[in-house]
Structures are given as structure tokens and as C-alpha cells.
Amino acid sequence: EICACLVGSEMCIRDRLMAAPLKNRIVLGVDPGYRTGCKLAVVDETGKVLDTGVAHITVSKGASLEREKDVIRKMLRKHHVTAVAIGNGTASRESEAVVAELLKELPYSAAYMVVSEAGASVYSASKLAAEEFPEYDVSLRSAVSIARRLQDPLAELVKIDPQAIGVGQYQHDMPKAELSAALDGVVEDCVNHVGVDLNTASFSLLSHIAGINQTIAKNIVTYRTENGAFTDRKQLKKVAKLGPKAFEQCAGFLRVSGAKNPLDNTAVHPESYGAAEQILQECGFRLADIAGQDRS
């Protein structure tokens, strides 16, 4: 029974982590609520926060409701929002109805999607969220998290304890240690299966890459901040505490978009570049032929 529950939980968490991302969209995140209102956050294509606010659209009526709707209207038009992520918790249906109505008013095409709020409150009150968004209230951090979940579920959900994401009704019937180990393994498998962009990946995402612990992940972010974007995988060797063995383990999972060598943006490990180039040559292709293609 325990094995069956573990397998079910692993499948559930894997499905959530591997949900398709929504790329190149400016997204409005809505964390629904009644008394405290709906918390709002607009993020750009990279997840950077552009705007925040609160709108009491679920309890207001008449002229008051129109004023609250205007808060969202202005955000949508000011930032040319093309996608809205609505949390599925309290007041979700009422918020959904208002958002759907407002999107129809826009002079351009836009859509909304209801996303799982599971773990958003846990993340927003965490030390990690406080370090990432010290200038924002806890409730607004939840709205940011909801918006980013639509953009890139994997990158956002790795910041949260897997058990807080919601992994099935039997998760509390299993030994906590076994469940935690199994779910952590699934998270690591998913991150390494997809790979991450070395120049945009957060500390949380990097720390799940094979060969990279939390110290090295912080050092990568620090190096990136101090020296600018990585231009190739070889630069990883300059990161503090990232030795030859760690490089051997992690290099194949880290992508460098726009690198001079297109293979740096693929799952091909540096030690196999020679073989990859030979295969391309024998098939009548050059490295330049794969440049610019999405290999993530």
C-alpha cells in the first residue's frame, strides 16, 4: 500500500512540475479573496514584477464595483497583458467571471487560466520569498507566484516543499521521511530532464541540478551578477567551489542561449562535443545549422 501511495504521489507531483510553460507572455497573476480583496501582480516575459495592486471585485457592487474593475482594466492596458493566471482558491469563480468580462473589452486578444494555488501561501511566507521580494507584502508575493506558475511551472514550484504542492489524498498516510525522499527525487529528475538556462535560472532551480549544491548555486548567481551573463559553459569553471567533478556532473543540464558554440544550448555534454560535430559533419550539416533552434 505504501509503495502504491508513493507511486501515486510521484506521478502527481511530476505532472504538476512538467506542465507546459507559457513563454513570451506578460501575465497578470490574481490571488482571489473576499474581505481582503484580490491581490494582483503583473510580471513580464522573464518573470520580473512590473506592477502590483489590490481590487475588491468579489464583494463590491454598482459604482463601487466599477471602480474596482478599473484597477484591473488599467493594469491590463498599461502593460498590454495577454494572459491572466487566476488562483483556484477562495473566491476563484467570482474573480474568474469578472476577469473574463474585462478581457472581452480589450482591443487585442488575451486569455485567462485558473491555476493551482497549492503551496503559494507557504512560499509567500518563506525566507526565500522574503529574500526575493523584500519590498512586497506576503499577500502580493502569492499573486506573483501564481503569475509565474503559468509562465514556467517548474521554475516556480521548485521553490516550494513538494509536500505543500499537493500530491494526492493519501500523502499523510505515508512515512514522512520516505515521502520526502521520493518527492525530492522526482523534483530533481524533472529539473535535470528539462535542463535550465544558466543565465536566467534562480538559485532554487540551480540547486536541483546534479552536482550543484546550495553553496555552488549561490556562487553561480553571484558570479552572474558580478560578471554579467555567461557566454559559454567553460565559464562555469571560474565559479567558486565548482570543481572538475561538479562541472562534469552539471554541465550537460545547463544551457547557455546565444553562446558562440550552439552545442552549449543543448543537452550534449562538453565531453561529447567532438562526437556531436563529427555526426553533424557526416550527415552533411554544420554547427551553424543548429544555431537559433530551441533545444531546451
PLM segments and residue spans:
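Charge-patterned, long linear interaction tracts outside catalytic cores
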Residues: 152-223
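A short, structure-level motif marking secondary-structure boundaries and short turns
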Residues: 56-57, 131-132, 186-189, 217-219, ...
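Phosphate- and other anionic-substrate recognition elements at nucleic-acid/protein interfaces
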Residues: 9, 14-17, 23-30, 35-184
